[in-house]
């Protein structure tokens, strides 16, 4: 696992893992996996956590060691690639493969599909990404602008 994660990541994961290893036995409860993963910035759904546990043969009332925790974190982070997800969604909407989508069409999709956004949330997103309400939205520019990491103050 060390070849996939930096030493800093491993140290951060170990620190969080230790907080949930209440009996200092090198194990955490499976029921603590979701919250510990979210504390580390991952965004698993309860279903994804259940699948991770099943993959490793761990019952929902069982425990997992740090090595298994590292593997699960690596797999979760690897599958959470927002740029790739956004690009795939935009490509599905672009039937003619033009490389862009009209802002009005993007607004409609954001308000009707998946985790539906409100009109104001779409307005805020467009403002943040510098999109004109009636303009064209180029995939690469849009993805780059909305996936910029939040500055740490």
Swiss-Prot record:
Keywords: Cell projection, Repeat. GO terms for molecular function: calcium ion binding; myosin head/neck binding. Expressed in the small intestine, in both mature enterocytes on the villus surface and immature cells that reside in the crypt stem-cell niche. CDD domains: EFh (cd00051). The keyword Repeat applies. GO terms for biological process: brush border assembly. One of its GO terms (cellular component) is microvillus. InterPro entries: CALM/Myosin/TropC-like (IPR050230), EF-hand-dom_pair (IPR011992), EF_hand_dom (IPR002048). Coiled coil: none annotated. Residues 8-43, 44-79, 81-116, 117-152 form the EF-hand domain. As part of the intermicrovillar adhesion complex/IMAC plays a role in epithelial brush border differentiation, controlling microvilli organization and length. Acts as a light chain for MYO7B and is required for efficient targeting of the IMAC to the tips of border brush microvilli. Interacts with MYO7B; the interaction mediates the association of CALML4 with the IMAC/intermicrovillar adhesion complex. Interacts with MYO7A. Belongs to the calmodulin family. This is Calmodulin-like protein 4. It comes from Mus musculus. The lineage of its organism: Eukaryota, Metazoa, Chordata, Craniata, Vertebrata.
